[in-house]
Design a protein with these regions (language model features):
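N-terminal auxiliary segments of SAM/dcSAM-dependent transferases
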Residues: 1-41
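Hydrophobic (often cysteine-bearing) scaffold residues that line and stabilize catalytic clefts
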Residues: 7, 62, 91
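Conserved alpha-helix/loop element of class I SAM-dependent methyltransferases that forms part
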Residues: 12, 16, 46-50, 56, ...
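Cytosolic histidine kinase catalytic core of two-component systems
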Residues: 23-24, 64, 110
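Residue-level signal for inorganic ion chemistry
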Residues: 29, 69, 160
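Glycine-rich loop at the start of a catalytic domain that most often binds anionic cofactors/ligands
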Residues: 41-42, 53
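Conserved nucleotide-cofactor-binding alpha/beta core module
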Residues: 74-161
Length: 161
């Protein structure tokens, strides 16, 4: 499979059509190899408009959703960002491309380890993945310039607001 062509098509046909037009975000999406963040069994689907199972009952966001989240934060490069739900680390990597620092919390230890490995393999050095429950745990580094919920929650964690 030609992942470079698939990545280009994803940006042009999925991301731009969702009004994600910020050049730095588009550039990050164009350069970040999403297939590294997807389980091997699903790599052929890495650039499709679908959620991808990560195991442990968790799903990787569809590319356009991850892109829209990163876009709507309007990060300028000086922010410290908290991400709740790191998953495989793809959204973490996108956020790291546009911020000073990302602290990502992941409740599943195996996924936290996977995210750390994926970030390291991608050369992302200013993002940290911790095993923690974002619904209850608050990193000492707060307050944060932006907080992203990378998964669904029954209600927003009040301690973060």
């Amino acid at each position: 499979m030609n992942f470079e062509q698939a990545r280009f098509n994803m940006v042009e046909q999925q991301i731009r059509t969702w009004n994600v037009l910020d050049t730095p975000i588009l550039q990050a999406l164009s350069c970040l190899p999403r297939e590294r963040f997807v389980p091997v069994a699903y790599q052929s689907l890495a650039y499709t408009d679908t959620e991808i199972p990560l195991g442990h009952g968790q799903l990787m966001l569809a590319p356009k959703v991850a892109a829209r989240l990163a876009h709507d934060l309007e990060l300028q490069g000086s922010e410290t960002v908290l991400e709740i739900g790191a998953g495989s680390g793809y959204l973490t990597a996108l956020l790291a491309q546009r911020s000073k620092r990302v602290i990502a919390l992941e409740i599943v230890p195996e996924l936290a380890a996977l995210a750390r490995a994926n970030l390291a393999q991608s050369g992302i050095t200013h993002a940290e993945v911790r095993v923690a429950d974002g619904a209850h745990d608050t990193p000492a580094e707060g307050p944060f310039d932006a907080i992203v919920l990378g998964g669904s929650v029954a209600e927003a964690p009040q301690h973060l607001l």
